Amino acid sequence: MVEQLYHTPDIYRIYVPLPDNPLKYLNCYVLVSNGETLIIDTGFNRPECKQALFDGLDELQVDFAHTKLFLTHLHGDHSGLTEELTVRGVPVFMNAIDYNYLCQQLASGGWQAMEQIFLSEGFPREEIEKQKKGNQARLYSPQHPFPATTVQDNDVLTLGDASLRCIHTPGHTPGHTCLYIEEKEILFSGDHILFDITPNISVWRNVPYSLADYLESLQKIKCLKVSHTFPGHREFHGDIQDRIDALTLHHHARLKEILDAIDHHPDCTAYGTAGRISWSARGRAWEDFSPNQKWFAMGETLAHIKWLSDKGAISSTRPLSLNMPTIQNTPAKETAENRYRALCHSSNLFFYSQRFSDNDFCEQVTHYA
């Protein structure tokens, strides 16, 4: 299915289904300007995605000899079909950090390194084995490194009469990058900003500050003038400034909830902490989560624990700061609420803490992208 979203440059959306995935579909964008074409993201490397992508490209009569591919980030639902385009002569553009991370992961087994971190934090080995069999990100991602031209923050891609500026927005992945057409106030936000669901912010191997990076990247986008936002998944509606505020509040709530959980269970592993906080799972208990759901929840919990540890709200009983959080020695009157509001003030989140009440915390939900 192809839908035209904008004229001059002509912008189309191809709905790429993601079967058996709560994300439902990927928004693949196709820009056409003065005889040149840019494809943004591809979908998983599986038959249903390939069929939808190439049916859409055929409908738009895309000439691969005058086409480029831009990947907003390394996740398989955005990069999986890259090799299907490179074999047709389409050059690939991608942020240097994510490209290098992807190549290293393919060469050295990045999944295994994350498994060791998760195992050390209480994730059961048998659930990791089950997760490996059903993790679509593993099964349908690129299996081999592909050639790419790497970009950095503020690099400009030229497409016919259009200029697209690369905006590095780390957090969802270390090298996540949005594209911005300034004169049209158009932002292709990838998975950095979604409207119907909340991007998953997880820990990454050798990336110490994924949540801090994400919160900073939200404010970076907030400084741009944006009238049209085209996200990587689901629909787009409402004001991007309001959505940025809502996403910031969501993580404020998650941090407060995790700090409360650690206050009450200071010797718990991150896996145990993840099981004590609220997730959007249609009322199911933690024990009923699938291994994949637990994997994403664990990663997000660790990212928030790392933020709290870096800010001094919690300390670790082992050298690795992701491991075994315990509350620091603080006066009895210093509750988790007071400590957290002090952290918000010192971390430029005071504006949000003033607007947020305890009753709001229980209403926050997370879906994974």
Task: Indicate residue ranges for each PLM-predicted region.
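Histidine-centered divalent metal-coordination motifs
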Residues: T72-H78, N95, H172, H176, ...
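A short catalytic or substrate-binding loop motif that flags glycine-/basic-rich loops and adjacent residues
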Residues: N21-L23, T149-V151, P170-T173
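Residue-level signal for inorganic ion chemistry
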Residues: H233, I258, L308
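Metallo-beta-lactamase
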Residues: T37, F44-R46, A137-P142, F146, ...
